[in-house]
């Protein structure tokens, strides 16, 4: 029996954000098609925004976690067993919300003003304050446009082949296995996945 803790990342099947700040894959059509009654606009958090799955931002999050693990104390049990990617596996939520979309795409990179494709975002230097780093990253992101990878849409409930291909694309882009998926709001709609599913 494996008694080591596992580090599991949880992401929606599409990008979301509250309030101001960069959301490179934001799409007004998705906002209209994927309303979230539990995440409306608020005076302190601003509007709830929606975009296509952003593999670049997800990779950045994995790098931040991996960096935290690499710089943690050897006795810090939070980071004793995670993979080099920062987590051992992923759970993707809200996949059912994408059923019936006329097209599916995910951002696999960003294109800068010179036409250069960036597949990752650099971690800020440790000499900068959090505020400085955030300002630089925001400025950098505002100069870019997403590069999209088109995927086949699906309308059937559950895990039809196109939904499985969408999960496989996320796994491929991030280099992390998708171990489970949420296909609805109830516990019965959560599904563990075997490798290759």
Question: Where in this protein do the model-derived segments appear?
Answer:
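Non-transmembrane, aqueous-exposed alpha-helical and coiled segments at domain scale
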Residues: 1-197
């Amino acid at each position: 029996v494996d008694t080591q803790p596992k580090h599991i990342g949880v992401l929606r099947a599409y990008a979301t954000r509250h309030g101001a700040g960069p959301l490179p894959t934001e799409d007004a059509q998705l906002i209209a098609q994927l309303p979230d009654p539990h995440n409306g606009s608020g005076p302190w958090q601003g509007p709830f925004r929606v975009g296509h799955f952003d593999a670049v931002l997800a990779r950045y999050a994995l790098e931040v976690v991996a960096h935290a693990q690499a710089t943690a104390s050897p006795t810090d049990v939070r980071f004793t067993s995670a993979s080099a990617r920062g987590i051992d596996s992923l759970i993707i939520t809200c996949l059912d919300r994408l059923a019936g979309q006329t097209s599916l795409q995910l951002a696999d990179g960003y294109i800068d003003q010179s036409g250069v494709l960036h597949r990752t975002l650099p971690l800020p230097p440790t000499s900068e304050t959090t505020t400085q780093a955030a300002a630089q990253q925001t400025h950098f992101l505002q100069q870019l446009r997403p590069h999209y990878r088109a995927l086949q849409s699906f309308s059937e409930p559950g895990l039809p082949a196109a939904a499985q291909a969408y999960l496989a694309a996320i796994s491929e882009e991030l280099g992390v296995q998708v171990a489970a998926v949420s296909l609805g709001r109830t516990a019965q709609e959560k599904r563990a996945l075997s490798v290759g599913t």
